[in-house]
Amino acid sequence: VDLGLQERFERDGYVTAPLYGQQELRALSGLYSRLHRDPQQEFFPSTYSGNPEYRSIVDREIRAITETATEGLLYSTQLRYASFIAKSPGPRGVVNVHQDMTLVDESAFSGINIWCPLEPTTQNNGALQVIPGSHRWIETYRGSTIRGIYDNLRSQIQARTMPVYLAAGEAMIFDQSIIHYSPQNFTARTRVVTNVFFTRR
């Protein structure tokens, strides 16, 4: 375990690290293409699909690849759920400033995602933007039906975010309570990432 990564994670709420090699990227890109014959519209997390068989296939296949890829990176953890997140071109793919849903008791643990693009993220295709250290601002409880406490300050908060540009297969490992957003994808291609939630074993 890289203690330097752990220290930066606790301070900033995120770290970046290599995750997938070319073989894994080809397998994941192929999986996405097979399951998505039609172009996705807007912002599409596979988690929100109403098709349980589709969700199960995505979860199983991504986790199988990611479990091998995280050996030596994570210690005593278990991958719980995996998904694709697709950001299509255009303004309807913008994801506003937010924090992810609360999935663990954050008074004792950190809920953590491994977010990894299948192609490089840039200023043109909606790279993830964060406020380092914002996971330590205020303890919050978050859910899909709970209004975010920062909703009235979105424009001010967005101005304080910084982009995190990643290579294909390079992961951003982040605390689910960190403030983040992703701007418009101005390219002609859908930007696809894998997102994996994990906990202590």
What is the meaning of each model-derived region?
Residues 83, 99, 116-120, 132, ...:
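Short, structured patches in soluble enzyme cores that scaffold and shape functional sites
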Residues 88-92, 120-124, 136, 171, ...:
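Short, charged/polar surface micro-motifs in flexible loops or helix N-caps
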Residues 75, 98-111, 159-160, 166, ...:
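A short beta-loop-beta micro-motif enriched in histidine and acidic residues
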Residues 3, 36, 171, 178-201:
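Non-heme Fe(II)/2-oxoglutarate
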